[in-house]
């Protein structure tokens, strides 16, 4: 087999090549209660003002502000209570001179009133109360349309539907929501050295950990996942299973078979399915041999067979592709600053990603590597909630240095590619 020539490209360029492809999933309609974490397929426009009417944000008394002028501790002013309303009720009384309506939180302000006195600001008697301070017009009132007015875009196309967005959709009567269909993912682990999780260990063999990990990462994104039988290092069967997966799924992820060894067939498989290789080497560690191809609107990700490299490839490349396919406004990894809490002395000829544990406090973020950090390591992934990103050309970092980290357990993303 001829060894394929590979020229590494920067991580940022690799991500950009992925999202430059034209691949958008269709819009579908789902029930409101099923819409969580989907991407909106259209703008949601306010069809009425919020609040719909002037209302009270407190329990208290609705009064005319003019009647409170001159009130003080030495000159308490008395009001007569003429009605009592709760949320959902509307008073039919017109508030007159030194009159008041007892009002509960959320109730509509009665005609004539333009201020609300909270109960704790009064001394109550049987059907009267007194106050000791003046109130201004619209004091303690939530005004009609102060949050949003008719015609405002309240949710944007491409926005992730979170619990707050569901509240907005329910407010405007959306029992069904138009969203972008989420892509389905095929996961194919390759390698004659792999055993299934229930198999007895043999000399020279290891259990397949990448397949279950990638499945979990994809399902965490809410994606439908198809798991394919572990593939031996055989070109013909590899071509067949990738073709089958492409017929049924929008994304095909293979693990292993991307290096330059005698039994790494992925480049030949991509040729056989007529896929355009976007890149086949990235200037990073681990996962430099990560390969991504594109065919018929579908992504084919060739992730490393080494667990840490496989995990890194999913976080950096698969996640943005999924968000891009769903038309998300925010696609790219979110990067924050953190203080490194222990030395990392290894030189970094290329951008290095370290599985790590971040702690966020009021004083800022700190981070420490989560364990053994070679590309084949697996335990460190289980204890990580982020990846430290060390720039290429650096010669190690000391405790106390500020570093960039990507929060892998966070759903947050950026509109701009900051890597």
Curated annotation (Swiss-Prot):
GO biological process per UniProt: Mo-molybdopterin cofactor biosynthetic process
EC number: 2.10.1.1
InterPro entries: MoaB/Mog-like_dom_sf, MoaB/Mog_dom, MoeA-like, MoeA_C_domain_IV, MoeA_C_domain_IV_sf, MoeA_linker/N, MoeA_linker/N_sf
CC cofactor note: Binds 1 Mg(2+) ion per subunit.
GO cellular component annotations of the record: cytosol
Residues spanning the signal sequence: none
Keywords: Magnesium, Metal-binding, Molybdenum, Molybdenum cofactor biosynthesis, Transferase
Pathway where it operates: Cofactor biosynthesis; molybdopterin biosynthesis
Entry-linked Pfam families: MoCF_biosynth (PF00994), MoeA_C (PF03454), MoeA_N (PF03453)
Catalysed reactions, semicolon-separated: adenylyl-molybdopterin + molybdate = Mo-molybdopterin + AMP + H(+)
Cofactor(s) named in the record: Mg(2+)
Function, as annotated: Catalyzes the insertion of molybdate into adenylated molybdopterin with the concomitant release of AMP.
NCBIfam families for the chain: Glp_gephyrin, molyb_syn
Family to which this protein belongs: Belongs to the MoeA family.
Protein name, per record: Molybdopterin molybdenumtransferase
Organism of derivation: Staphylococcus aureus (strain MRSA252)
Gene: moeA
């Amino acid at each position: 087999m001829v060894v394929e020539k590979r020229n590494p490209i920067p991580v940022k360029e690799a991500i950009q090549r992925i999202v430059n492809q034209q691949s958008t999933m269709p819009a579908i309609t789902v029930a409101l209660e099923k819409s969580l974490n989907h991407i909106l397929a259209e703008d949601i426009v306010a069809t009425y003002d919020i609040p719909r009417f002037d209302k009270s944000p407190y329990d208290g008394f609705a009064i005319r502000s003019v009647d409170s002028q001159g009130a003080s501790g030495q000159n308490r002013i008395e009001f007569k209570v003429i009605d009592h309303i709760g949320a959902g009720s509307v008073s039919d009384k017109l508030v007159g001179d030194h009159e008041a309506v007892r009002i509960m939180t959320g109730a509509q302000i009665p005609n004539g009133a333009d201020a609300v006195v909270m109960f704790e600001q009064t001394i109550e008697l049987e059907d009267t109360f007194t106050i000791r301070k003046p109130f201004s017009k619209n004091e303690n009132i939530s005004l009609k349309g102060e949050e949003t007015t008719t015609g405002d875009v309240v949710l944007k196309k491409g926005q992730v539907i979170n619990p707050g967005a569901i509240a907005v959709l329910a407010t405007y009567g959306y029992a069904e929501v138009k969203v972008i269909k989420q892509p389905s993912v095929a996961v194919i682990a390759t390698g004659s050295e792999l055993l299934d999780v229930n198999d007895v260990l043999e000399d020279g063999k290891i259990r397949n950990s990448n397949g279950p990990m990638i499945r979990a990462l994809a399902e965490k994104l809410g994606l439908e996942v198809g798991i394919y039988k572990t593939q031996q290092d055989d070109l013909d069967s590899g071509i067949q299973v990738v073709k089958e997966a492409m017929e049924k799924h929008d994304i095909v992820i293979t693990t292993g078979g991307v290096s330059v060894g005698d039994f790494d067939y992925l480049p030949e498989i991509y040729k056989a399915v007529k896929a355009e290789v976007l890149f086949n080497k990235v200037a990073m560690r681990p996962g430099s041999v990560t390969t991504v191809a594109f065919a018929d609107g579908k992504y084919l990700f060739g992730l490393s067979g080494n667990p840490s490299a496989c995990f890194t490839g999913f976080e950096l490349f698969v996640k943005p592709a999924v968000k891009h396919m769903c038309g998300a406004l925010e696609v790219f990894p979110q990067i924050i600053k953190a203080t490194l809490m222990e030395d990392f002395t290894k030189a970094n000829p290329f951008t290095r990603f370290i599985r790590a544990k971040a702690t966020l406090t009021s004083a800022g973020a700190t981070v420490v590597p989560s364990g053994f950090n070679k590309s084949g390591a697996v335990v460190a992934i289980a204890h990580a909630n982020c990846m430290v990103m060390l720039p290429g050309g650096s010669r190690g970092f000391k405790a106390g240095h500020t570093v960039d980290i990507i929060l892998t357990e966070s759903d947050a993303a950026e509109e701009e590619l900051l890597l």
